[in-house]
């Protein structure tokens, strides 16, 4: 009995050494106190538990005098509690010093293991053995990390150097001088740093470029939160259909052609009404085709008007300012000149960039499209 | 439309689909001609007895839908699940699903140079990877492609590989903090960096993120996910790290040997991950 006690106190002393050997002196006291508090709490719980144990034992028809076996059990309990406390203390200490144990080449881990070994000599019940196992798991985990540490030591890979080199790599060797922390830097520097790194990184990956529609896809509006249980199913359906894009009814090449013809006819109609209204003033080509609100509509209009010109319903001419104008081809006015125009086919290419379009809109101060949407 | 598979023994079974395929080839719209090469090859495989009287046009349309679906799904870079493909695109064409997928994969390859790959064998989720080796000049052509997150991803991948294929989350943040990226602070480019790394990259399967057991305080570890191995390789990441260091990859012998072994094992099973073969 006394021998055991001796070994136990020995363990305690060793723990003291362990604590001292680790570099966290200023924290020791505080943590120790906390640990003690924590333990006291746990002890309290133990006490309660055991108290209830004994109380459940009480009703047993034991003789009132203390049986010697029972007496020893009580002693055992005291001892077990002590062992548990020591185990917990050990686990706590090792846990707290995880970093030091992993990163320094000290024997702390093996010392802790030895201590646990000593403690295990006194273990007789499952409860204490479970704590021993818990410690062992922790210790082996640390061992694994230590082994990994050893590995990286051999590899000479230094993250801190890597970080500095990253900055250098992008050409930011002056960063350290100008601002102490990278996070203090200007937004534009942050943007260009990650932008350049992104470019470099993409050349090392086979990432598929993502596919996007030029004008984006339809906005998937969040469907209204599902109505509460009471609501009708039909209501849900109505809500759901709000998310769907309008379905294309028919996709047919012929149908497409028809719409072109229709559009050409419609625009010809517009042009002819204009000519009837103002028979003497030719219409400016740009003012006619440009839709100030839509570049694509403008391009479409140019396309349709080209049919009108080809079919000889109107012609394009340059006025005195060398700007294109549209004028009617008067059938009654067939003189030699117009004859030669209509029979000698000329081809012209019109180029119009988005910027041209913008410039024309602003120069001609076009605020409204002459060709309005038919739909 | 008749969906039920017809009896194998009946002589008409062979002729029917054959006629459908052939007939539609002449009437089909011009778009179907563009894919003439692939439909030729598919005719034989698709004339399986289960094919109902579907015209080639219908099947072509289905393949086109599937291609579009895959491209749009790829926007978020989250692996595309087979169940989603079946639910949203394939529908009644379930019986010819493997062939539809094969044709879609062929077309993605012809038109876009993308390869449809099953993320992991038998995982039934797919990703698109670029088959064309990146060219330096491409970077300028690429234009604005959303947030430039690849650099961050590459750094994390590099750290993981150089540190022996596993790294704790704490280590990652210790590193990124030096580059002005904090787990709890909103970043100009990355928004919520913690979410980006531990959720978005994980869902895209670039990274694996799991709790390290028996740590107090709790810590997590990061490893490469399956997508990383498909889009890049140990050797490429090592070369990236080496380029940043302005050193030779061989200066890290352990990593170099590992990367070399990885290259060799890649070279051996050539078509193991192709989706078509798994069907």
UniProtKB/Swiss-Prot annotation, chain A:
Residue ranges, annotated region (Disordered): 30-68
UniProt keyword list: Chromosome, Coiled coil, Cytoplasm, DNA damage, DNA recombination, DNA repair, Nucleus, Repressor, Telomere, Transcription, Transcription regulation
Chain coiled-coil ranges: 23-51
Subcellular localization(s) per the UniProt record: Nucleus; Cytoplasm; Chromosome, Telomere
Biological-process GO terms, alphabetical: DNA recombination; DNA repair
GO CC terms in record: chromosome, telomeric region; cytoplasm; nucleolus; nucleoplasm; Smc5-Smc6 complex
Biased composition (Acidic residues): 42-60
Family: Belongs to the NSE4 family.
Oligomer and partners: Component of the SMC5-SMC6 complex which consists at least of SMC5, SMC6, NSMCE2, NSMCE1, NSMCE4A or EID3 and NSMCE3; EID3 seems to be a testis-specific subunit. NSMCE1, NSMCE4A or EID3 and NSMCE3 probably form a subcomplex that bridges the head domains of the SMC5:SMC6 heterodimer. Homodimer, and heterodimer with EID2. Interacts with the C-terminal region of CREBBP.
Function: Tissue-specific component of the SMC5-SMC6 complex, a complex involved in repair of DNA double-strand breaks by homologous recombination. The complex may promote sister chromatid homologous recombination by recruiting the SMC1-SMC3 cohesin complex to double-strand breaks. The complex is required for telomere maintenance via recombination and mediates sumoylation of shelterin complex (telosome) components.
Name used for this protein in its record: EP300-interacting inhibitor of differentiation 3
Species whose genome carries this gene: Mus musculus
UniProtKB/Swiss-Prot annotation, chain B:
Subcellular location: Cytoplasm; Nucleus; Chromosome, Telomere
Short name of any one Pfam family annotated for the protein: MAGE
Cellular component GO terms, alphabetical: chromosome, telomeric region; cytoplasm; nucleus; Smc5-Smc6 complex
UniProt tissue specificity: Ubiquitous.
Cytoplasm among keywords: yes
MF GO annotations: protein dimerization activity
Subunit structure: Component of the SMC5-SMC6 complex which consists at least of SMC5, SMC6, NSMCE2, NSMCE1, NSMCE4A or EID3 and NSMCE3. NSMCE1, NSMCE4A or EID3 and NSMCE3 probably form a subcomplex that bridges the head domains of the SMC5:SMC6 heterodimer. Interacts with PJA1. Interacts with E2F1 (via C-terminus). Interacts with NGFR (via C-terminus). Interacts with NSMCE1. Interacts with NSMCE4. Interacts with SMC6. Interacts with EID3.
Name of the molecule in the record: Non-structural maintenance of chromosomes element 3 homolog
Native species: Mus musculus
């Amino acid at each position: 009995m006394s021998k055991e006690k001796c070994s136990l106190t020995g363990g305690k002393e060793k723990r003291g050494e362990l604590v001292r050997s680790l570099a966290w002196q200023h924290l020791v006291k505080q943590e120790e106190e906390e640990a003690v508090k924590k333990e006291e709490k746990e002890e309290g719980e133990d006490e309660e538990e055991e108290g209830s144990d004994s109380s459940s034992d009480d009703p047993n028809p034991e003789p009132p005098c203390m049986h010697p076996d029972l007496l020893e059990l009580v002693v055992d309990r005291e001892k077990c509690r002590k062992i548990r406390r020591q185990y917990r203390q050990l686990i706590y200490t090792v846990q707290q010093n995880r970093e030091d144990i992993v990163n320094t080449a000290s024997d702390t881990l093996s010392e802790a293991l030895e201590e646990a070994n000593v403690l295990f000599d006194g273990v007789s019940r499952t409860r204490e053995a479970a704590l021993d196992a818990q410690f062992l798991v922790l210790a082996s985990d640390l061992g694994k990390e230590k082994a990994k540490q050893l590995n990286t030591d051999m590899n000479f890979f230094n993250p801190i150097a890597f970080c500095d080199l990253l900055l250098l790599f992008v050409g930011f060797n002056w960063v350290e001088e100008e601002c102490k922390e990278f996070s203090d830097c200007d937004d534009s520097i942050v943007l260009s740093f990650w932008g350049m790194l992104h470019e470099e990184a993409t050349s090392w990956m086979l990432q598929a470029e993502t596919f996007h529609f030029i004008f984006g896809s339809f906005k998937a509006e969040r469907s209204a939160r599902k109505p509460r249980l009471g609501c009708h199913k039909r209501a849900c359906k109505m809500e759901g259909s709000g998310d769907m894009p309008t379905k294309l009814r028919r996709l047919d090449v012929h149908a497409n052609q028809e719409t072109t013809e229709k559009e050409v006819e419609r625009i010809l109609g517009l042009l002819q009404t204009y000519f009837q209204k103002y028979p003497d003033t030719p219409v400016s080509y740009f003012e006619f085709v440009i839709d100030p609100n839509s570049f694509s509509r403008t391009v479409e209009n140019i396309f349709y008007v080209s049919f009108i010109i080809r079919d000889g319903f109107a012609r394009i001419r340059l006025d005195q300012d060398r700007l294109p104008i549209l004028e009617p081809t008067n059938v009654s006015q067939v003189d030699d000149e117009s004859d030669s125009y209509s029979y000698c086919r000329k081809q012209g290419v019109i180029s119009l960039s988005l910027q041209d379009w913008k410039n024309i809109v602003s120069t001609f101060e076009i605020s409204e499209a002459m060709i309005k949407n038919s739909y | 439309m008749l969906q039920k598979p017809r009896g194998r023994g009946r002589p008409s079974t062979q002729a029917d689909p054959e006629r459908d395929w052939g007939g539609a080839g002449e009437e089909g719209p011009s778009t179907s001609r563009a894919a003439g090469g692939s439909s030729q090859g598919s005719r034989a495989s698709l004339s399986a007895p289960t094919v109902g009287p579907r015209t080639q046009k219908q099947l072509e349309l289905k393949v086109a839908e599937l291609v579009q679906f895959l491209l749009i799904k790829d926007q978020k870079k989250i692996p595309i699940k087979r169940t989603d493909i079946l639910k949203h695109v394939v529908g009644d064409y379930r019986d010819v699903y493997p062939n539809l997928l094969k044709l879609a994969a062929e077309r993605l390859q012809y038109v876009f140079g993308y390869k449809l790959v099953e993320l992991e064998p038998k995982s039934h989720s797919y990703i698109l990877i670029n088959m064309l080796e990146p060219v330096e000049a491409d970077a300028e052509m690429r234009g604005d492609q959303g947030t430039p997150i690849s650099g961050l991803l590459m750094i994390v991948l590099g750290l993981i590989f150089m540190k022996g294929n596993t790294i704790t989350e704490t280590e990652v943040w210790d590193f990124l903090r030096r580059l002005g990226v904090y787990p709890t602070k909103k970043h100009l480019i990355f928004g919520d960096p913690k979410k980006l790394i531990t959720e978005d990259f994980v869902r895209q399967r670039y990274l694996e993120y799991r709790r390290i057991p028996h740590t107090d305080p709790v810590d997590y570890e990061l490893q490469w996910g399956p997508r990383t191995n498909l889009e890049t390789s140990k050797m490429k990441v090592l070369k990236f790290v080496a380029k940043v260091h302005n050193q030779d990859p061989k200066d890290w012998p352990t990593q170099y040997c590992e990367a070399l072994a990885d290259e060799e094992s890649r070279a051996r099973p050539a078509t193991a991950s192709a989706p078509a073969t798994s069907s």
